[in-house]
Swiss-Prot record:
It comes from Solibacter usitatus (strain Ellin6076). This is NADH-quinone oxidoreductase subunit N 2. The chain crosses the membrane at residues 16-36, 45-65, 87-107, 119-139, 141-161, 176-196, 219-239, 258-278, 285-305, 313-333, 340-360, 385-405, 421-441, 464-484. Pfam families: Proton_antipo_M. GO terms for cellular component: plasma membrane. The keyword Nucleus does not apply.
Length: 493
């Protein structure tokens, strides 16, 4: 008889309950869409499955959090250490859950206007989130790669979801080809790590690399090839080329999900690798990462200046935000890692909010993605105009919005670790960002409306999502203490 207890114990299923819930409900949506709801008018009920999936996922995360607190344990390991649930993983998974819920509830009306199918769309949201779960909890190269590819494959399909639009198809193809190319580098880097340690466990790899000099050729090869794959996922320069096309070509709801959840998952993945296996090689990667962060800030901010398509402008803005997060990793102290966590949290709300306003602009004949589409918005829909103003001020890092808090901790960490020059340069780019964000503000508040078209009636879900993101963006900036305590739990140990 085979003793399965050698391979499976009672904590294994507990460590992946949220992922199991997401996968089961994702499959259930596909089955119900095909067998139970063939009539397009019935497909609105599929959204209920997404809400239930997120409710069960949230309950699973809460139970894991409660177990760690009750046991006074720093982490919960499953499957022989391949999955580790700790404060870091739970924090990021709450971010994924919020992003998925917001995107799902605003997608119903958007899909109706676009004339696209609902079933596979909602399933892809859940399957992508399932992949993100393993990116945040994975402590084994195989687990991390499976999570990454599950997430990436879902986004390849979602970016090209508008099958009748050429730009959507082109964006998906470019994203797929470049994504596959970067995954090749990542796998090669993983294979070098396995060759160094003889194990796929991150802890074993960290010990093996620590026993070698930082400039060891094999360590440098593993670092350089792995970094290509990781930096592509966070859209850092020079691996950012896919982001503007993918953001512009994808459905706006997908762009919102991609810009927030995918970036948060990729940041979690990057932290797992750089603060785990590659931590002892900091002398090598810190100056390289600092250079890449500054170049990312430069290209992202300067390229955004001349954009007239709002989604493309926000794509370059997203690239620059990746640069700020990388600077937190360059600092590398507790303040820096806490700063990254705070930045990811506030970026989720303010960037989602900005894209939600774009979604609200969608009318029967106007997509609502160009600056001209927002002209005179304050006269037609002052609520949307002022919400967009709040989100843009936050993206620029202006107090008392949440965005200021994220940048403050990044800059503080840089100064604490002696990187004052980097902090000064990063601060200068805030001024550049204010300039191109003001282009949108100018269009909404100063320019006259170019075409007298009535606003499309927005759904209740969209109004709730806008209220949530707007309140969160202001609340985190005005009363940050509870949110800072939440970010403190995410410190990587």
């Amino acid at each position: 008889m085979i003793d399965f207890s050698l391979f499976y114990n009672s904590t294994d299923h507990f460590s992946i309950i949220p992922a199991v819930m997401l996968a089961l409900f994702g499959c259930a949506i596909l089955l119900f869409d095909f067998l139970i709801f063939p009539d397009p008018r019935q497909r609105k009920f599929l959204l209920i499955f997404v809400v239930l999936a997120e409710a069960f996922t949230g309950f699973g995360l809460f139970r894991q959090q409660a177990w760690l607190a009750a046991q006074n344990a720093p982490e919960l390991s499953g499957f022989g250490g391949s999955v580790t649930v700790d404060g870091f993983a739970i924090f990021f998974n709450w971010i994924f859950l919020v992003a998925a819920v917001v995107v799902a509830i605003v997608s119903y009306k958007y899909l109706e206007i676009s004339g696209e199918h609902h079933g596979e769309y909602y399933s892809l949201i859940l399957f992508a989130q399932c992949g993100m779960y393993f990116l945040a909890t994975g402590t084994d190269l195989i687990t991390l790669f499976i999570g990454l590819e599950l997430m990436a494959l879902c986004f390849y399909v979602m970016v090209g979801f508008l099958r009748t639009e050429r730009r959507s198809n082109e964006a998906a193809l470019k994203y797929l080809l470049l994504g596959a190319f970067s995954s090749g580098f990542l796998v090669y880097g993983f294979s070098v790590m396995y060759g160094i340690a003889g194990s796929t466990k991150l802890s074993d790899i960290a010990a093996a690399i620590a026993s070698r000099p930082p400039w060891d050729p094999m360590v440098f090869l593993a670092l350089s090839t792995t970094s290509v794959g990781l930096l592509f996922k966070v859209s850092a320069v020079p691996f950012h080329m896919w982001a503007p096309d993918a953001y512009e070509g994808a459905p706006t709801t997908v762009t919102a999900y991609l810009s927030v959840a995918s970036k948060a998952a990729s940041i979690a993945f990057l932290l797992r690798i750089f603060l785990g296996p590659l931590a002892s090689a900091r002398a090598v990667w810190e100056p390289l990462l600092a250079f890449i962060a500054i170049i990312t800030l430069t290209i992202g901010n300067l390229a955004a200046i001349n954009q007239t398509n709002i989604k493309r402008l926000l794509a370059y803005s997203s690239i620059s935000h990746a640069g700020y997060m990388l600077l937190g990793l360059v600092a590398g102290n507790d303040t820096g890692i806490k700063g990254i966590a705070v930045y990811v949290m506030v970026y989720t709300f303010m960037n989602l909010g900005a894209f939600l306003v774009i979604i609200a602009m969608r009318r029967a004949s106007i997509i609502g993605e160009d600056l001209d589409d927002l002209a005179g918005l304050v006269h037609k829909s002052p609520g949307y105009a002022f919400l967009m103003l709040i989100f843009l001020l936050s993206l620029a890092g202006i107090p008392p919005t949440a965005g200021f808090l994220g940048k403050y901790y990044i800059f503080l960490a840089l100064i604490q670790t002696g990187h004052t020059g980097l902090a000064i340069v990063a601060t200068l780019y805030v001024a550049v960002a204010i300039y191109y964000y003001f282009k949108i503000v100018r269009s909404m508040f100063i320019r006259e409306e170019m075409e007298k078209t009535p606003m499309l009636a927005t759904s209740f879900g969209l109004r709730c999502a806008l209220a949530l993101t707007g309140i969160a963006t202001l609340a985190i900036g005005i009363y940050p203490e509870p949110f800072l305590r939440l970010a403190q739990t995410s410190l990587f140990r």
